[in-house]
Amino acid sequence: MAKERGDLLFPSIESEKRKHKLKRLVQAPNSFFMDINCHGCRTITTVFSHAQNVVICSSCSTVIAQPTGGRARITAGCRLRQKSD
């Protein structure tokens, strides 16, 4: 039997998130800016989601985010919030 594929004009949100950024129904980047609260001093720092350098808190000099091959790894204890447009 053929597996039901779903509606091509109205794909589910989950299937759109799994697709490559250029093959989505509406093209959109995977990267974003985010506000990170430092767990030591509660200072808010704006960081790019795919940061390529180590991000350090400006007031207490602790490491907030470390680069990986894709998205930056946020240090445990730090809270983040995605910035809106």
UniProtKB/Swiss-Prot annotation:
SUPFAM superfamilies listed in its UniProt record: Zn-binding ribosomal proteins (SSF57829)
One GO process term, biological-process aspect: ribosomal small subunit assembly
Keywords assigned by UniProt, alphabetized: Metal-binding, Ribonucleoprotein, Ribosomal protein, Zinc, Zinc-finger
Cofactor note as given: Binds 1 zinc ion per subunit.
C4-type zinc finger span: 38-60
One GO term describing the cellular component: cytosolic small ribosomal subunit
KW Ion transport (keyword) present: no
Pfam assignment, any one: Ribosomal_S27e
Required co-factors: Zn(2+)
Coiled coil: none
Database matches in Gene3D superfamilies: Zn-binding ribosomal proteins (2.20.25.100)
Family the UniProt entry places it in: Belongs to the eukaryotic ribosomal protein eS27 family.
Protein's recorded name: Small ribosomal subunit protein eS27
Species this protein is from: Dictyostelium discoideum (Social amoeba)
